[in-house]
Amino acid sequence: MWNISEVVFQLPTSSASDRVLQPLWDYLLLRHYTLISSPFFPVLLAFSSYIIFSVPFAVLDVLGEKAPLFKYKIQKDRRPTVGMMLRTLWTAVYNHLVFVLPAVLITNVVMPMPPLPTVAPTVWEMFSGGLGALLVFDTQYFLWHMVHHKNPHLYRWVHAIHHDYISPFSWSTQHLSGVELMTVGFWSNIDPILLKCHPLTVWTLTVYSIWMSVEDHIGYDLPFSPGHLVPFGLLGGAMAHDMHHQKPSSNFAPFFSHWDKIFGTAITVKLTQKSEKEKQVA
């Protein structure tokens, strides 16, 4: 066990010219070392982020037309019921109890966590490491996702549960089979290790990627969402993933849009409307 009393003497001094994230990292090490050094902390962080980000949109769905943001609802004629929300939430809880927690225990026995570093990452290290991990994961999941939609057996066995609902909602983000959840979890853990990301980078990336995943499934095309704020249509967002649930052979990438554009699987509302008009004319 790493002696926390030694941290005080190992911590680098922080100054205006030093790493701007060092004071935050010092605080986490000194005040919350027991929590952040636990092998269960990443799971707690990811699952609590899923809950926190999903609740506001669950409230919007319950309010329906009364909600001020209902005008941004993509499929206004399809609304999740409380029963659907509870079912998808239970799927997430079940998968974590049956698959994730035992996997964490086994991994910690086979490969214990190394001591946390005393030096914080630079802002550039956090940005470049986080972006790199997102791009790698986006590529992995795009290929995995496309293969599972192309192969009927894989689709039925692994991925079909996620398409139980044509109109996605926040809680359905983790409505996954155990196999899919463990695959996604494996990539989410191994990619930052291969890229040598700092733990603070990994945790920040975890929260941000969970937000992006939930935002993909909220069923609302909000004008202030990342998909609209990031220029050149680089991100997919809620509209792109909603279209995937309506047209499953399109928009396979989880976050970015470049792979779908390269492979010709990118579908937008405008393209869909154009295709429908052409069919009507024909």
Curated annotation (Swiss-Prot):
- Give every Fatty acid hydroxylase domain span: 133-265
Keyword line: Endoplasmic reticulum, Glycoprotein, Iron, Lipid biosynthesis, Lipid metabolism, Membrane, Metal-binding, Monooxygenase, Oxidoreductase, Steroid biosynthesis, Steroid metabolism, Sterol biosynthesis, Sterol metabolism, Transmembrane, Transmembrane helix
Motif Histidine box-3: positions:
240-246
**What is the recorded membrane topology of this protein?**
Multi-pass membrane protein
Required co-factor(s) are: Fe cation
**PANTHER family xrefs:** STEROL DESATURASE
Under which name does UniProt file this protein? Cholesterol 25-hydroxylase-like protein 1, member 1
Instruction: Tell me what organism the protein belongs to.
Output: Danio rerio (Zebrafish)
Q: Which gene encodes it?
A: ch25hl1.1
